[in-house]
């Protein structure tokens, strides 16, 4: 029995790109020509011109669960049918006379009066499309909806004479055998459904070039799929495949194969048959071994085998000489083969989070690489001069390894680099002059190392924008830090600093200054010169007072001074108009808050836990920060003065002969002053 025998007649109805139901011979009266769509121009309505839109431009999309015969998406919008000013007016299905289609329940029915006298078997089929502006609620997901969706799929396939069919996100559970009628299809999109298996009739789509089956529940593929010999792109991401279906190896025309996020444990040697593959994604599976067959895929440009359980790579990987992107991150790799040096077209090599203790010296041959990332391994040193050989590198990430010193190779290895990350290693010093050629270096992360001092030439890092030196053993900052005038982020938390140099005030572009968990007792007055500062973190130090110049930090939104020895807050804190978050908790000597704090109108969060605020009643403190701020406002002398002047003005305006007798006004003011004095 031939699965692909067709029972369709020549008069089968299809949906043209204008969104109009038309027979293969064309429907007179109406139909936009040339551009179609909601706002497209063209010849519209009347005149009896036949629409002749090519099948290549046609697209049928199905909106699942709507209960309609089908919905049209893309550039065509039938909701614009009521606008006679554009070409879509004809495309909406209105008659040549311009009669507006009508419907009920927010739906517009395609209708043509000229069809009334036609025999029933030759009339164009009706398509119902929901208006976007309809207030009718969309149906909720119910058990019965997929059944309705499957029925609508059958109807859609019966009309199928197009080249691109989109049935994605439609709650489809079954693809009917009538799919064999769609022999003209070149693109079929079935992603985000509930399909458990494909019918054998899928093999009848011999013109298919793009098949998207991602986000379903497929566990296998039918053998008949091998008949789709022109298939170029196959997407099977997010399914339930326990192996690569054998039929895939017979699809010799494949150029792109997505198998991400399945349950695949092995790759068969038959993979070598897919010699036309340029992109292969096996990401997020359970693969433990990648066989030598990978070396036969000489046209590969992208290979993603990340997030698997690979321990080794075959030497044959070096045969994939056209690879530009190789992602090996989040595996269990113990080594990288020397043949990796053959991949001279390699631009991106991801080796993050494996079990590597070294990398091969042959990597220096991959001179096209612009990023080198081995984060999260156990590497102690790089081959001599390797980074210097990779002169195109702009980003180097060596974080979370076992480096005890900077890589050998001198200043030349950082010539074109703008970002260096050596976080979480065991480096105890930054070599003098190591960045002397790194004129473009803007970001340096040395967090969680063993630094006790900074190099004397730190003042030459003039282009530095972000400097992270947190969690080291630094005891002082050199005065030359003043030369880093492009610095915007300075992280010095968890060190052993006792003071901050006055020259800190020269860092006029600084936005974030983090000094948490040091031994600082006093902040320099020059801190007030950092007018761009937005976050100042002083938590867990030994600070007894804040400088009054802090009131000049008009852009400050976050201030943390918790866990210190504050005795008071300066009145100037009321000048911080942008302040949103203030942490002053756990200051055992802080007994009162300045009334000026109530002037911080943008303050959203105030933490005063474990502060002995003796001047504020306990019941107010128990009510939380918002009640404390309200109490400060109510008892602020500024509020009393304001009330005094408001009362005085009101009294003057209400006095007999106000404005004409200065003495009367003075008396009233005096009375109000007396009452204000009594209140005080």
Curated annotation (Swiss-Prot):
SMART domains hit by this protein: LRR_BAC, LRR_SD22, LRR_TYP
Compositionally skewed regions (Low complexity) per UniProt:
1-19, 73-86, 97-106, 669-680
Which residue stretches belong to region Disordered?
A: 1-54, 73-149, 658-680
Matching entries from Pfam families are given as: LRR_1, LRR_14, LRR_8
Q: Where is the composition biased (Gly residues)?
A: 26-49, 87-96, 658-668
The record's LRR repeats, renumbered to this chain, cover 161-182, 184-205, 207-228, 230-251, 253-274, 276-297, 299-320, 322-343, 345-367, 368-389, 392-413, 416-437, 440-461, 463-484, 486-507, 509-530, 532-553, 555-576, 578-600, 602-623
According to its UniProt record, which protein family does this protein belong to?
Belongs to the SHOC2 family.
What does the record give as the function of this protein? Acts as a Ras effector and participates in MAPK pathway activation. Probably acts as a regulatory subunit of protein phosphatase that specifically dephosphorylates Raf kinase and stimulate Raf activity at specialized signaling complexes upon Ras activation.
- What is the protein named? Leucine-rich repeat protein soc-2 homolog
């Amino acid at each position: 029995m031939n699965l692909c025998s067709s029972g369709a007649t020549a008069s089968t109805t299809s949906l043209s790109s204008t969104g109009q139901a038309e027979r293969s011979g064309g429907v007179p009266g109406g139909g936009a020509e040339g551009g179609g769509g909601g706002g497209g121009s063209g010849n519209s309505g009347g005149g009896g011109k036949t629409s002749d839109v090519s099948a290549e431009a046609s697209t049928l999309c199905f909106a699942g669960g709507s209960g309609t015969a089908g919905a049209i998406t893309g550039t065509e919008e039938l909701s614009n049918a009521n606008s006679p000013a554009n070409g879509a007016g004809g495309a909406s299905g209105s008659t040549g006379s311009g009669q507006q289609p009508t419907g009920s329940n927010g739906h517009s029915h395609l209708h043509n009066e000229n069809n009334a006298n036609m025999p029933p078997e030759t009339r164009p089929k009706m398509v119902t499309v929901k208006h976007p502006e309809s207030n009718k609620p969309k149906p909720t997901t119910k058990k019965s909806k997929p059944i309705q969706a499957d029925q609508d799929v059958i109807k859609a396939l019966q009309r199928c004479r197009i080249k691109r069919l989109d049935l994605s996100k439609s709650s489809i559970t079954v693809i009917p055998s009538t799919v064999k009628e769609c022999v003209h299809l070149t693109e079929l999109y079935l992603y985000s459904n509930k399909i458990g298996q494909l019918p054998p009739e899928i093999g009848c789509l011999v013109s298919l070039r793009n098949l998207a089956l991602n986000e379903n529940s497929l566990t296998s593929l039918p053998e008949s799929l091998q008949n789709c010999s022109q298939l170029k792109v196959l997407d099977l991401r997010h399914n339930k495949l326990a192996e690569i279906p054998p039929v895939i190896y017979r699809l010799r025309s494949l150029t792109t194969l997505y198998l991400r996020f399945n349950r695949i444990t092995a790759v068969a040697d038959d993979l070598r048959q897919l010699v036309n593959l340029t992109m292969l994604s096996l990401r997020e599976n359970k693969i433990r071994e990648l066989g030598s067959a990978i070396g036969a895929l000489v046209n590969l440009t992208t290979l993603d085998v990340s997030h698997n359980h690979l321990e080794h790579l075959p030497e044959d990987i070096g045969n994939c000489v056209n690879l530009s992107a190789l992602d090996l991150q989040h595996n269990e790799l113990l080594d990288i083969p020397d043949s990796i040096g053959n991949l001279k077209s390699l631009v991106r090599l991801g080796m993050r989070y494996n079990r590597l203790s070294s990398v091969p010296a042959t990597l220096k041959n991959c001179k096209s690489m612009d990023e080198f990332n081995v984060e999260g391994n156990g590497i102690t040193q790089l081959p001599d001069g390797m980074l210097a050989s990779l002169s195109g590198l702009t980003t180097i990430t060596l974080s979370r390894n076992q480096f005890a010193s900077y890589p050998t190779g001198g200043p030349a290895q950082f010539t074109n680099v703008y970002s260096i990350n050596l976080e979480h290693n065991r480096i105890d010093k930054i070599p003098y002059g190591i960045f002397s050629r790194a004129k473009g270096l803007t970001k340096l992360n040395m967090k969680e190392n063993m630094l006790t001092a900074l190099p004397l030439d730190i003042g030459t890092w003039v282009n530095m924008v972000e400097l992270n030196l947190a969690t080291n053993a630094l005891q002082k900052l050199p005065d030359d830090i003043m030369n880093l005038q492009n610095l915007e982020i300075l992280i010095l938390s968890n060190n052993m600093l006792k003071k901050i140099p006055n020259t800190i005030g020269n860092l006029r572009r600084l936005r974030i200054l983090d000094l948490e968990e040091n031994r600082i007792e006093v902040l320099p007055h020059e801190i007030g010169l950092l007018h761009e500062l937005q976050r100042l973190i002083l938590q867990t130090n030994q600070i007894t007072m804040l400088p009054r110049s802090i009131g000049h930090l008009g852009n400050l939104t976050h201030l943390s001074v918790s866990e210190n020895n504050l005795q008071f807050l300066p009145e100037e804190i009321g000048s911080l108009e942008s302040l949103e978050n203030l942490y002053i908790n756990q200051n055992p000597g802080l007994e009162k808050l300045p009334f000026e704090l109530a002037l911080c109108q943008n303050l959203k969060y105030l933490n005063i836990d474990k502060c002995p605020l003796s001047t504020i009643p306990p019941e107010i403190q128990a009510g939380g920060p918002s009640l404390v701020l309200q109490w400060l406002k109510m008892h602020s002398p500024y509020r009393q003065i304001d009330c005094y002047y408001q009362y005085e003005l009101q009294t003057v305006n209400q006095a007999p002969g106000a404005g004409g007798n200065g003495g009367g006004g003075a008396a009233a003011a005096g009375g109000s002053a007396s009452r204000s004095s009594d209140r005080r």
